Amino acid sequence: MSASRPAAVMVLAAGEGTRMKSRRPKVLHEICGRSLLGHVLAAVAELEPQRTVVVVGHAREQVTEHLKSIAPHAITALQEEQKGTGHAVRMAIEALRAQNVELTGTVVLTCGDTPLLRGATLRDLVAAHEAEGNAVTILSARVPDPTGYGRIVRDAAGAVTGIVEHADATEEQRAVDEINSGMYAFDGALLSQVVHRLSADNAKGEEYITDAVALLRGDGHRVGAYIAPDRTEVEGVNDRVQLAEARRLLNARLLEQLMRDGVTVVDPASTWVDVDVRVGRDAVLEPQTQLQGRTVIGEGAQVGPATVLCDTEVGEDAVVSHTVAREAVIGPEATVGPYAYLRPGARLDRGVKIGTFVEVKNSTVGEGSKVPHLTYVGDADIGKGVNIGASSVFVNYDGVNKHRTVIGDYARTGSDTMFVAPVRVGDGAYTGAGTVVREDVPPGALAVSAGPQRTIEGWVERKRPGTPAAQAAERARARSEEDR
């Protein structure tokens, strides 16, 4: 089935979501790197609607600000008081009219808390709606336990005759497993007319959009329903339990697609990816790996176990284990970890080794260079073929400003070297163990700042008499004298 571009899509996002027990509006809670509302709008965008209207209410400032970053062209409609779904639709229509937009053609109504909704399902809903010539087409779903949901009522021929709420349903109707999702495709002109006929004469004093279905059918218009192929797509999120379940389901969907595209996921139950993550073929994701934001993993790379990468690029055939990296670039065939920390601005070229307990921040490390152990690299430019000795520190902060250190190609630095920036170590230069580099080191030079070793015989026995160390020293001295 093919569908035209809808005249408008309305997204209802005005509710408070009290069951979330949160200061944050429900629709702004996130799963897999995107807000609930963001997931819905991403599905809506696949329809390429002429207009998108988001109905806001509770915490409207926060929701509106969020919309500026994820859907800047969306129109916001204010529902000052939450008086029901029908009232929300009326506010959306008024917002469109304020921009001189009269609804003609198909209008889709969605909810802002259904993050598993697929764009393909919305396209099929619109296609079925237009092919059948319906005034309204309900997006329905078949569920194993329909308790609490409105049921889709059909006649003997299978034609939709209406929606009956659970409380009003007969025993026969309660046995029906096809439920109303609260999402619809409407004829825009008819919706604009019928929405003003909705009544708030009910227990809650609210206007319900479901009443529009009965009114349109009563006027002799055709009503239909399109059954979602996956019932989880229409499940809303109302509390933290449902939020966790939605996250699990979406993560499983994303991982399944990665595996079908040629990625090995060793343990899907402990591996988490965001929707904007990209992973190349033959990459391996080990257990307890989290890929967040816009992380990109190259072909053949191995990531994990116990690794968190956020907005990080990993090159082909790189190996990253037990590592946390944020806004970093890891080059092809590089090796990182275990227990490394790459902070924003860390750039590792091809074949770089970053070893155990190494932190890199706002620095470049050239091709084939190694920082193997217990080192902090901050605000540095390290050339190619360099080896940084264990326990070295790039001292980049003078208490007021940060300064850079430059290490030339093929330099070798001894263990426990301190580079007090700003300082430059030339190509092929060496530093001795324990050196504090405060001045530039010319190419090919050896920098040594430590003085001759001073040994004070008998110091422990005199200054720490009776201690285990002193006793051990006395025994060793006695053995030495016996050997003579």
Curated annotation (Swiss-Prot):
Residues 457-484 are annotated as: Disordered. Residues 1-240 are annotated as: Pyrophosphorylase. Its EC number is 2.7.7.23, 2.3.1.157. The keyword RNA-binding does not apply. Coiled coil: none annotated. Residues 262-484 are annotated as: N-acetyltransferase. Its cofactor is Mg(2+). Homotrimer. This is Bifunctional protein GlmU. It comes from Thermobifida fusca (strain YX). The gene is glmU.
